[in-house]
Amino acid sequence: MTDTKIKGILGTKLGMTQVFDENNRVVPVTVVKAGPNVVTQIRTEERDGYSAVQLAFGAIDPRKVNKPTSGQFAKAGVTPRRHVVELRVADTSEYEVGQELTAEVFEDGAYVDVTGTSKGKGFAGTMKRHGFAGQGASHGAQAVHRRPGSIGGCATPGRVFKGMRMSGRMGSDRITTQNLSVHKVDAENGLLLIKGAIPGRKGGLVIVKSAVKGGARA
């Protein structure tokens, strides 16, 4: 469900640090370089069947952009950008093609949802990937310390059920962390200081938008 209050911006995760609040307490924050984003297209109910704004972010060599995508940027009157996403909104009247969005779309104390790609861990076992306890370290255990154990009976069920937690590739998943507080907006430097941790590595792309479950707090 869309909401007229929903705002959003693309940015880059710079890393974590700590700051002090007005009560002199330490607050762990993640620093996000937010924008600048540019509006490249506006979707409307009449023409597209839904309301949304298309945001573009990040520099890219124009020679690396194919012709159809280059044409879309040319139509919007902006230079090509590396990342393009759509933000669903109920009211597009606040946006216009070519408009630039910065960190100032949010205010101090706003609640946001942050989406990013988690760090890739490669092939991982069940203890790391799913938190399995493993087996005994002694008392007769031999070369089974980190094994998962049984994955199904021989005759019944005679197969491995779908969804069985096993070893495999871990990380590099799209993850959204909800209801994080914007501790401070540094408009001069285009930074968002978000309380707590957010998904992804340093330098990774993140999408910051108004909290879906934030209610009046957002």
Swiss-Prot record:
InterPro entries reported for this sequence: Ribosomal_uL3, Ribosomal_uL3_bac/org-type, Ribosomal_uL3_CS, Transl_B-barrel_sf
Protein keywords: Ribonucleoprotein, Ribosomal protein, RNA-binding, rRNA-binding
Cysteine pairs bridged by disulfides in the record: none
UniProt key word Lipid metabolism: no
rRNA-binding in keyword set: yes
Family to which this protein belongs: Belongs to the universal ribosomal protein uL3 family.
Record-linked PANTHER family: 50S RIBOSOMAL PROTEIN L3 (PTHR11229), LARGE RIBOSOMAL SUBUNIT PROTEIN UL3C (PTHR11229:SF16)
Protein name: Large ribosomal subunit protein uL3
High-level lineage: Bacteria, Bacillati, Actinomycetota, Actinomycetes, Mycobacteriales
Chain's gene name: rplC
